[in-house]
Amino acid sequence: GALKINGKVTDWYNPNLTSAQMVKKNNNDDYTDKLLSDAVSWYKSKYNDDCTQYDNNKDGYIDGVFLIYSAYDFATGEELGKTLDENLFWAYTTMDYNAESNLKSPNGGYYFWASYDFLYEGYGTDKVDSHTFVHETGHMLSLTDYYSYTTKDKNGYNIYSPMGGVDMMDYNICEQDCYSKFVLGWNEPYYVDKEGEITINSAATSLDSI
């Protein structure tokens, strides 16, 4: 594939807080920034790693952290009769803008926050499903959501969706589309300067597109 991600899956980091306590500390919607900082510090100490290998552009920040929490996401919790804060216990990608750059021991900056349960929300299967994680990784690569945050119907559902929902950056369906692949530099255009024949292969199995 065009993208190869290298990293490390750690043991669970325990902040010694219940989900209710985390909600109380999240008054300014930035407590996950502190969790990121604490978790990165814990990682450096536990694994004796300065994290320079995860700073490919040498800006003093880890290129990306997947911060996965063990609590239910709020929607799953709702199905099980548990009330969880929807602003905190959901999936999103953000940046700790207060983190300081450190070239010798890079700190966490850009990260996504998502529940472990998202791995099992698949389409009629009990197997591991990575759609939400792929969607959030798209954000980490600079892609935006391909739907409107503000145009909703009376039930609160998005009604403006140029991709019709059928896209990874829209409704977490399929894969990254041809436009996204082009924006990310995964495919290259043909420069036609003379008569000839070009074979366009399937976009699902190649990087070709029109």
What role is predicted for each listed range?
Residues G64, S70-I210:
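Extracellular hydrolytic enzyme modules, especially secreted metalloproteases
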